[in-house]
Structure formats: C-alpha cells, structure tokens
C-alpha cells in the first residue's frame, strides 16, 4: 500500500484514507473481531465524514469569512446608524446580535466538528501505525520466506543432483543387470548343456545297467547249468559208485573216486571263478573304454555345441539388429509413403489449382484476344477513315495545284473510264474492310498487324533492290530515249497494220487466252495447295467462301468497269487514231474501227501476257527490270511489254490470288485490279507462296519492273523523253482497254453519250486520282510504308503513270502528258489509276496473306 504525505487536515487525504480504511476493513481477514467491528464503525463514520467533507468541508471557512465580512459591514452600518439615528442603532444592534448568535452557533458547530475530526485523525493515525507495523511484519515475513526459498532452492538443487546421481546409478545398475542377464543366459545355456549331457549319461547308465542285467542273467543261467551238470555228475557218480559197490573192490575205488571228484570240482570251481573274473574284468574294461569314448565325444560335442551356441547367439544378435533395422526401415518407408501420399495430394491440389488458373488465364487471354481484335478492327476502321481523309486531302491539293492545267488538258472524256475503274476498287476496299470485320478469329487480326510490320521491312528491302535496278535502267532509258520516239511512230504504224491481223486472230487469241487462264488457274491451285498444306480445314472453307464472295464482287466490279471502259474507249477510239488516220467519223464507223482495234489488241494482249509470264520468271531468277528494257527497243512490243509489267504482271499475281482470272484477260488492264483488293483475304493462298519460294511472284508484280524504271528514268531523263515513253505505254494501254471495252461495243453503243461529257469525265478523273492516292496511302498507312518508300511505291504505281507523269516529276505529271497526246494520254491515265490500284491491292494482299499464313501455323 502506498501512503501519500499530504497533511492530515487535507480533505482529500481524509477521503482517501477513509475509503481505504473502509475497503481494508471490509476485505481484511484479521483474527480480531473487535478490530473488524471497529473498522466497520469507522467505515460508517468515514462515510458520514466523507459526505460531510464533500459537501460542507469548505463551508466553515467561507462562512467564517462571510461572518467576518458581515461583521465589518455591520460595524460600518452601526457607525452609520449612530449617525442616522437611534432607531437604526436598535435595529442594527438587534441584527448584530442575531448575526453574532448565528455566528456563535456556527463557531460552536465548527469547534465540535474540529474535535470530531481531530479524534478521527487520531484514530486514522493509530490505524496507520498498525498498518505500518503489519507492513513491517510482512517485510520480515518476506525475508524469512526468501531465506526459506533459498534453502528450498538449495535443497532442490541437491535433490536434482541426487536425482542425477541416482539416474547415473540406475543406468549403471541397468548395465549391471544387463550383464547379469547375459551371464544368467550363459549359465542357463550351460545348465541346459549339462542337463543334456547328464541325460545322455543317464541313458548310457541305463544301457549299462541293462547290459549288466543281461550279464547277470547269463551268470545265473550258467550257474543253473553248473548246478544241473553238477547234479547229473553226482547222479552219474552215484551210479558208478553203485556199480563199483557191486564189485569187490568197491571201497578202494570209492575213495579214489571221491578224491577225484573233489579235485575235479575244485578245478571246475577254480575255472568258473577264473572265467567269471575274466568276464567281469573284460566287462569293466569294455565299460571303461566305452565311457572314455563317450566322454571324449561329449567334450568334442561340447566344443561344437559351444561354438554353435556362440554362432547362434551371434546370429540372434544380428537378427535382432536386422529386425531393428527392418523396423526402422519400415518406419522410414511408412513415413516416406505418407510423405509421398501427402506430396501427391499437394501435387494434385496444385495441379487442380494450376489448371484452374490456366483455364482462367486462357479465358482472360481469349477475352484479351477478342478485345485486341476488336481494337484492331476499330484501329483498321480508323486507319481506313484516315487513309480516305488523307487521300482526299492529297487529291484536293493536287486538284488545287493542277486545276488550270486539268481544265485545259482533260476537258475530254479521259477520266470517265478511270472513275469507273476506280469506283469498283473503292467498293472492293470497303468489302475488304467488311471481311476484316467479319473474320471472327482474333489471332488472325493480331498476326495480321505483326505481319504488316514484317512486310514493311520486306517491301523496303525490295524497294531498295528495285532502286538499285532502276538506277541501272535509268541510264539505259536515257540512252534509248531517242530510239523510243522512233519506236512510238513505228508502234503506231504497226498498230494500224496489226488491227487487220488482229481481227482474224481474235478468235485464236480468245482460245489461247482461255488456255492461259486455265494454266494460270492450275498454277494458282498448285500454289494454294502448297500454301494450304499447313492450314486448317476451317480456313480452307473460309477461303472458299471469301473467294466466292470476291468472285461475285469482282464480277460486279468488272461488269461496271467494262461498261465504263467501253463507253470511254468508244469515245476515245476516234481521237486515238485521229492523228494518224483521220478526225472522228460517224459513230458507226467509229464502232467498226473499235472492233478492229479490239481484235488487234486481243493478239497484243496474248503477246503481252506471254511476255509478262516470261518477265515474271526472269524477275524471280534475276532482276525484274531486264525484261522491260528489251521491250522498249521494239516499237510495238516495247509498248506492250511495258503493259505486262504494269497490268499483266499485276494480273498474274491476281491470277495467283483469285480464281476469277478467266474473265481477266479481256479486262487485263483495270477491272481485275479493283477486284484484287477483295482478294487480299481470299488470296490467303498466295500468302503461303510469298513465304515459301514463290512469294517473289506477288512481290515482283507489286514492284512491276517497268513501273519503277519509269520512276528512275523520270528523275535523270528529261520530261520530253518521259512523255514519249508515256505515249508508248498509253498507246498500249489504250489498245488493251479498247480490247476489253470494244468487245462489248455493240451492247454499249448507246452509253457513249454519257461518258462523252467532259465534266463528268473530269470529275471521274479527279475521283480516280483521289482513289488511287487513297489506295496507295492506305497501303502505306497499314504499317507497310510510311516513309518516302511509300512515295516510291506510289511512283511505282504511277511510273506507268509516272512515264506519263515524269514530265513534271511532281504531282500533276499526268496533265502534261495529256497535253502532248490527248487520247493516248487519257488511256495512260487509265493505266495510272489501274496501276495504283494494283500496287495498293498487292501490298494489302501481302499483308493479309502473311496474316493468313500465321493463322494457319497457329
């Protein structure tokens, strides 16, 4: 208990002490009942005093102070009252008396309270002294207890020491007991051995006793025989004596005989005794020998038994140790089996958890793939929108830059067929986008994006190679620029001559074209088989469905393109031949001429296709540019071979990419090119050939050797030479387009007026240029070419344009060419639009084909 050092008069101290005393008195277990009663009385008094202290302890001082103040005030009042009057003095005195009486009463009460509190303080001091004595007694008891605890701890240590000693003794005793047990076991074994030997000896003694009994019986029988023989002998002797007595000399004989019998009996007795002694001696010797042999055998057996017992004991110890080891091994085996079972359970649980996590991750991966595909589709849509906007912006820029030249130069009907051809390409691009959206697998979209990046590098490498080849070809083109002018004139003359021949060969050309188309289809099938070997059946079904859809769309686009091409070419045919032949004639004559030109162009198309195939093969083996240069040497063939690199080479990849090429030969120039963008996803078959050995074919057509050649020659060569080359190409293109369009001249003769309108054609020209730029930029924005490499790709597309465009070397090159040669330049513009479509669609096809190949592998 802790006691505060506050003064005893402090009310807080009193309150605390009274409360502690009350609690202590209630909780105390002291033996004095009087103390208990006193504490209870104190507790009651303390409660009263505490309540009084809490309430009225501070009252005396305040009351006393108030009385003092009141007395002072009363004195003041009395003084004032003396001044004021006697009445007031009386009242004041009476008031003072009352106040003094009250103060006296209060003072008496305070004095009583003080006495009571002093008495209570004395009691508290006495109780405190008692408590201090108790506390001192407890401290002494604590010391005593500590001493006892020390003693007990020492005793405990001693006991623990004794216990350890006893444990050691017990261990030693156990060891002694173990040794005694071993000795006891040894003694027991020795006892058993001795008992066994004793039993054996007893058996031998029994056997000896039996033998002795037999010998006794024999002795008895011999004695009986001796007695019998003795009796017989006596009888015989008696008979003899009787016979002797019958004679005279009986007495003497009897004496003699008697002496003889006694001696004989003595001798016989001596012999029998000797014989019995001899037999006894022999029996003893035999028994001794037998006993010695048995003892020797017993000793030997004892040693053997002892060694055997030692071996048995050793074996027992080994057996015991082995049994202990076996038990330990069994325990370890059981523990290992339990551990193994636990591990298997944990492993199974882990497997289940891992499988669950794998399923969850697969589901999440599937969801992320779907989301990625959705984002990619959205990205593709945005890219397409961006491409369209970029193309429109570029087209508007070109239109603004070359607006005056175009209005002056292209007032004719040049751009009508271009617009018609461009329009299907735009529709095809839209259908292609729809196909991308339709494709459900998201892996395909992902890998498409990756393959676009890979194709980027490939296209850049190819373009770098093409630039090297173009640099060499540019020099050749510069040297042959003068020859090209003469060749153009010769080409025009030969074109006129070939028109007559082409009419006859039109039928043969159609048959040959059909054969070539069939061969191309076979090649496509072979390539598609090689590409589809690693693909799944689902992809083949999807490719077939896409191919059918692409064929239908291409058929529609080709129909529209043929109609537009026929209209435009019908309008163009008279001016195309206006410089060499005559001004435009009546529509009937123009149609007849167009038919002739179509026949001539059919033969040229066949030649161009053959040249294109050869050029494609040569491009695969070596550089793609070589077949184009020799074609430039000849007047008409150079022009036509320039076509094969652009339209026909572009068509050959389309043949490889889609089965629709039976219709392509007539529409070699444009209709299939717009249709090709639909094929980029059906052409998944060519995708594989691009990755195997054959992929160079689609690449070479995309980089048509001639188109890039015009690009490079345009840079080094003058614009006039470029214009001449463009004129040759435009003539060939016009022939091809005329072949396609004039086949349907009879059906579409009425539609010439619609295409003849210069304004409509100009609008179509602008739209086609925009679409061509859109396709080129679309291919670029797909991730393949965003740098000047894309501009080169556009030039490659434009090269055939560029041969027309190179004169300016900038954006509006086509307008200058059209100024030089109106009709042919218009046809060249057709080629430009077509070539742009070819390049763009080919690039897109590469991207899609790569994506399809990765899908098949996965």
Swiss-Prot record:
Residues annotated as region Head? 2-99
| Name by which UniProt lists this protein | Neurofilament medium polypeptide
The record's Pfam families line, in alphabetical order, gives: Filament (PF00038), Filament_head (PF04732)
Region labeled Coil 2A — which residues?
261-282
GO CC terms: axon; cytoplasm; intermediate filament; postsynaptic intermediate filament cytoskeleton
List the Gene3D superfamilies hit by this protein, alphabetically. 1.20.5.170, Single helix bin, Vasodilator-stimulated phosphoprotein
- Bias class Basic and acidic residues marks the residues at 525-541, 556-572, 602-623, 651-664, 675-727, 744-771
Residues annotated as glycosylated are 47, 427
Acidic residues composition bias: residue spans: 484-500, 509-524, 542-555
Region called Tail, residue ranges: 408-858
């Amino acid at each position: 208990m802790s006691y505060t050092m506050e003064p005893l008069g402090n009310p807080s101290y009193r309150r605390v002490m009274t409360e502690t005393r009350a609690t202590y008195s209630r909780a105390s277990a002291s033996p004095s009942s009087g103390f208990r009663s006193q504490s209870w009385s104190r507790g009651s008094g303390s409660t009263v005093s505490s309540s009084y202290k809490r309430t009225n302890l501070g009252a005396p001082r305040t009351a006393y102070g108030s009385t003092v103040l009141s007395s002072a005030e009363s004195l003041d009042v009395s003084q004032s009252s003396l001044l004021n009057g006697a009445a007031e003095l009386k009242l004041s005195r009476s008031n003072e008396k009352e106040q003094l009486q009250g103060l006296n009463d209060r003072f008496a009460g305070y004095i009583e309270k003080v006495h009571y509190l002093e008495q209570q303080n004395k009691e508290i001091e006495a109780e405190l002294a008692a408590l201090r004595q108790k506390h001192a007694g407890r401290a002494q008891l604590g010391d005593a207890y500590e001493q006892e605890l020390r003693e007990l701890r020492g005793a405990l240590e001693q006991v623990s020491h004794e216990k350890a000693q006893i444990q050691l003794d017990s261990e030693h005793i156990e060891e002694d007991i173990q040794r005694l047990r071993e000795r006891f076991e040894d003694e027991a074994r020795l006892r058993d051995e001795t008992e066994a030997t004793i039993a054996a000896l007893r058996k031998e003694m029994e056997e000896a006793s039996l033998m002795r009994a037999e010998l006794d019986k024999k002795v008895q029988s011999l004695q009986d025989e001796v007695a019998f023989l003795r009796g017989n002998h006596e009888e015989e002797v008696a008979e003899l004596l009787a016979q002797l007595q019958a004679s005279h000399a009986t007495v003497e004989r009897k004496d003699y005989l008697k002496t003889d019998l006694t001696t004989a009996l003595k001798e016989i007795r001596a012999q029998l005794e000797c014989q019995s002694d001899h037999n006894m001696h022999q029996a003893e010797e035999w028994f001794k020998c037998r006993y010695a042999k048995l003892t020797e055998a017993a000793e030997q057996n004892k040693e053997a038994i002892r060694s055997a017992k030692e071996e048995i004991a050793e074996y027992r110890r080994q057996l015991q140790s082995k049994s202990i080891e076996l038990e330990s091994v069994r325990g370890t085996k059981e523990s290992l089996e339990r551990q193994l079972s636990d591990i298997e359970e944990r492993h199974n649980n882990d497997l289940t958890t891992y499988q669950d996590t794998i399923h969850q991750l697969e589901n999440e991966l599937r969801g992320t793939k779907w989301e990625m595909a959705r984002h990619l589709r959205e990205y593709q849509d945005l890219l397409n929108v961006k491409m369209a906007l970029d193309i429109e912006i570029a087209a508007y820029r070109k239109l603004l830059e070359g607006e005056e030249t175009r209005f002056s130069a292209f007032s004719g009907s040049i751009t009508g067929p271009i617009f018609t051809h461009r329009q299907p390409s735009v529709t095809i691009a839209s259908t292609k986008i729809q196909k991308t959206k339709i494709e459900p697998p998201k892996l395909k979209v992902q890998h498409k994006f990756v393959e676009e990046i890979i194709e980027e590098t490939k296209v850049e490498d190819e373009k770098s190679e093409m630039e090297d080849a173009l640099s060499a070809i540019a020099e050749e083109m510069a040297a042959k620029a003068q020859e090209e002018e003469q060749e153009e004139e010769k080409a025009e003359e030969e074109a006129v001559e070939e028109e007559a021949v082409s009419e006859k060969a039109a039928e043969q050309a159609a048959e040959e074209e059909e054969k070539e188309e069939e061969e191309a289809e076979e090649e496509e099938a072979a390539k598609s088989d090689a590409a589809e070997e690693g693909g799944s059946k689902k992809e083949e079904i999807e490719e077939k469905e896409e191919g059918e859809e692409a064929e239908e769309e291409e058929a529609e686009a080709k129909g529209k393109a043929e109609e537009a091409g026929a209209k435009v070419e019908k309008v163009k045919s008279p001016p195309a031949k206006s410089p060499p032949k005559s001004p435009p004639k009546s529509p009937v004559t123009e149609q007849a001429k167009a038919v002739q030109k179509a026949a001539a162009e059919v033969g040229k198309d066949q030649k161009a296709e053959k040249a294109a195939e050869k050029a494609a093969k040569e491009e695969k083996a070596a550089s793609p540019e070589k077949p184009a240069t020799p074609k430039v040497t000849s007047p008409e063939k150079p022009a036509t071979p320039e076509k094969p690199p652009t339209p026909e080479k572009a068509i050959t990849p389309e043949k490889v990419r889609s089965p629709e090429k039976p219709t392509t030969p007539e529409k070699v120039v444009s209709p299939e090119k717009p249709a090709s963008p639909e094929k980029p996803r059906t052409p998944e078959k060519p995708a594989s050939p691009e990755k195997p050995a054959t992929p160079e074919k689609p690449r070479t057509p995309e980089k048509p050797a001639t188109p890039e050649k015009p690009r490079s020659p345009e840079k080094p060569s003058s614009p006039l030479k470029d214009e001449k080359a463009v004129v040759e190409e435009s003539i060939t293109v016009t022939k091809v387009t005329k072949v396609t369009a004039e086949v349907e001249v009879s059906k579409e003769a009425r539609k010439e007026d619609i295409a003849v309108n210069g304004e409509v054609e100009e609008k179509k020209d602008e739209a086609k240029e925009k679409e061509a730029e859109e396709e080129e930029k679309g291919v670029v924005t797909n991730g393949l070419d965003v740098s000047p490499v894309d501009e080169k790709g556009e030039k490659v597309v434009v090269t055939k344009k560029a041969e027309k465009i190179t004169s300016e070397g900038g954006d509006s090159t086509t307008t200058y060419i059209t100024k030089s040669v109106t009709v042919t330049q218009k046809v060249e513009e057709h080629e430009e639009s077509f070539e742009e479509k070819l390049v763009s669609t080919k690039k897109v096809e590469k991207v899609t084909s790569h994506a399809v190949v990765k899908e098949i592998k996965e």
